[in-house]
Amino acid sequence: MSVRKILRMGDSILRQVSIPVTENELQTKEFKKLIRDMFDTMRHAEGVGLAAPQIGILKQIVVVGSEDNERYPDTPNVPERVILNPIITPLTKDTSGFWEGCLSVPGMRGYVERPNKIRMQWMDEKGDRFDETIDGYKAVVYQHECDHLSGILYVDRLKDTKLFGFNDTLDSGRNVLD
């Protein structure tokens, strides 16, 4: 198990745009180790997802996955998945709001509204290509993590800063994504 340091808001790397992963990289030992390290880091931090920029790697790589967890008792599980070079297209103007958190913004959360139905095209770690319609909580998770690849944090999407604060100060029982 190799857990990497998660960068925190204020680190300039988190504000940079990531570059695509090439198919030639997929078979390298370095790439395979990076994917394992990302999953190890995400699980160790008890997150639902992790983007490569959060560990200082400016590549278009996201890992997601969650199981039943006391930290997220009211959210559905998210299957483990490696997402490379994602393209997200909103399919509706309807939005869903969630209290989001982020491993790069520890101890805080904010209310963010996002399109509740998206089309996502991506490649996995084997080079297989996918084109899927995604909705609900899973769409929120994917959009949150993929934002990191464009240098965007969830705090940039807050519409009302009164709905942003420390976990231990905000009312309990709100859904949190991080």
Curated annotation (Swiss-Prot):
Q: Which Gene Ontology terms describe the biological processes this protein takes part in?
A: co-translational protein modification; translation
- Residues crossing the lipid bilayer are none
Q: Key word Ribosomal protein present in the record? A: no
User: Per the annotation, how and in what number is the cofactor bound?
Assistant: Binds 1 Fe(2+) ion.
The keyword Transmembrane helix appears for this protein: no
Listed EC numbers: 3.5.1.88
Looking up Gene3D superfamilies in the UniProt record yields:
Peptide deformylase
- Which InterPro entries does the UniProt entry name for this protein? Peptide_deformylase, Peptide_deformylase_sf
Q: What class of enzyme is it?
A: hydrolase
Q: Where is the active site?
A: E145
Keywords for this entry?
Hydrolase, Iron, Metal-binding, Protein biosynthesis
Q: Which Pfam families did the record assign?
A: Pep_deformylase
Q: Which reactions does this protein catalyse?
A: N-terminal N-formyl-L-methionyl-[peptide] + H2O = N-terminal L-methionyl-[peptide] + formate
Q: Name one GO molecular function term.
A: peptide deformylase activity
Q: Where does Fe cation bind?
A: C102, H144, H148
Its needed co-factors are:
Fe(2+)
What domain of life? Bacteria
Q: Which PANTHER family match?
A: PEPTIDE DEFORMYLASE, PEPTIDE DEFORMYLASE 1
* Family as reported in the entry's similarity comment: Belongs to the polypeptide deformylase family.
HAMAP family, A to Z: Pep_deformylase (MF_00163)
- The protein, known as: Peptide deformylase
